[in-house]
Amino acid sequence: MKVRASVRKICENCRMIRRRGKVMVVCSNPKHKQRQG
């Protein structure tokens, strides 16, 4: 899980979602998981 100020899609499988007010990126590739912080 990467914590970044600006999250963005890395590949076409990445999906932007909101969980508990935080923007997150989930993907089939675990390296692409990101959270805005």
UniProtKB/Swiss-Prot annotation:
One of its GO terms (biological process) is translation. SUPFAM superfamilies: Ribosomal protein L36 (SSF57840). It is found in: Plastid, Chloroplast. Coiled coil: none annotated. InterPro entries: Ribosomal_bL36, Ribosomal_bL36_sp. Keywords: Chloroplast, Plastid, Ribonucleoprotein, Ribosomal protein. The keyword Plastid applies. It comes from the Eukaryota. This is Large ribosomal subunit protein bL36c. It comes from Staurastrum punctulatum.
